[in-house]
């Protein structure tokens, strides 16, 4: 997947950072970082959210800085 493209499979458009890979993005509008760790219903997902931890970590919601 092209990090430059950063598609959102479930809708909307992502404007991601250079290193964004946007895997499984559920955000409607992602800014700076497109968070695969954000749950679909996270209202703050589009607001400078940062994913913490490794892929496949326990609770994904706990990894997402915008969903605390």
From Swiss-Prot:
Binding positions (a divalent metal cation 7): 51, 64, 66-67
Sequence positions that bind a divalent metal cation 6: 38, 42, 45, 67
Residues where Phosphoserine is found: 33
Cellular component, GO, one term: microtubule
Entry GO MF terms: cadmium ion binding; copper ion binding; metal ion binding; metal ion sequestering activity; protein kinase activator activity; zinc ion binding
Residues that, per the record, bind a divalent metal cation 4: 34-35, 45, 49
Binding site residues for a divalent metal cation 1: 6, 8, 22, 25
Function per UniProt: Binds heavy metals. Contains three zinc and three copper atoms per polypeptide chain and only a negligible amount of cadmium. Inhibits survival and neurite formation of cortical neurons in vitro.
Family as reported in the entry's similarity comment: Belongs to the metallothionein superfamily. Type 1 family.
Name of this chain's protein: Metallothionein-3
Lineage: Eukaryota, Metazoa, Chordata, Craniata, Vertebrata
